[in-house]
């Protein structure tokens, strides 16, 4: 059974961090359709292709060998919840962009997930200072309900 989020008044000291119409949560809501995908790290890979000079594929060990990036950010879901000071670990998206060498004609990025979800972003937003591919949340590996083994994090 789903627990109902108790919505309390927002402390005025942090109210500026909550967009209009959002509510603050301490939980990390699970929002996906259908069964939770199961990833086998022995066969998992990250494919980067399309309008780039250097398409490539990384298996899990190659991804984990990339330089690490950690950040603490507020996240605001389109379903109207906000969670402050979330801690993420993974790889800065600029590591991936530098390897792929996008062509000048690449204006958008289309991201695919194992379960069929897609999201597109303008290249200018994808190449932002806080965008990352995260494999950790709050110092632990991502859980399957939250995107294990890898999740695109776009805080803004």
Where are these regions (language model features)?
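Structured, non-membrane catalytic/scaffold regions adjacent to prosthetic-group chemistry
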Residues: 1-156
């Amino acid at each position: 059974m789903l627990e109902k989020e108790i919505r309390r008044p927002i402390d005025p000291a942090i109210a500026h961090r909550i967009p209009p119409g959002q509510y603050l949560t301490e939980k990390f809501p699970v929002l996906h359709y259908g069964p939770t995908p199961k990833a086998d790290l022995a066969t998992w890979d990250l494919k980067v292709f399309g309008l780039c000079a250097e398409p490539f594929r990384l298996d899990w060990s190659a991804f984990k060998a990339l330089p690490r990036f950690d950040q603490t950010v507020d996240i605001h879901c389109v379903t109207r919840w906000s969670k402050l000071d979330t801690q993420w670990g993974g790889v800065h998206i600029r590591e991936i962009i530098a390897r792929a060498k996008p062509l000048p004609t690449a204006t958008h990025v289309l991201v695919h997930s194992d379960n069929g979800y897609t999201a597109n972003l303008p290249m200018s937003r994808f190449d932002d200072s806080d965008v990352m591919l995260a494999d950790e949340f709050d110092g632990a590996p991502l859980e399957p309900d939250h995107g294990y083994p890898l999740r695109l994090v776009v805080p803004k």
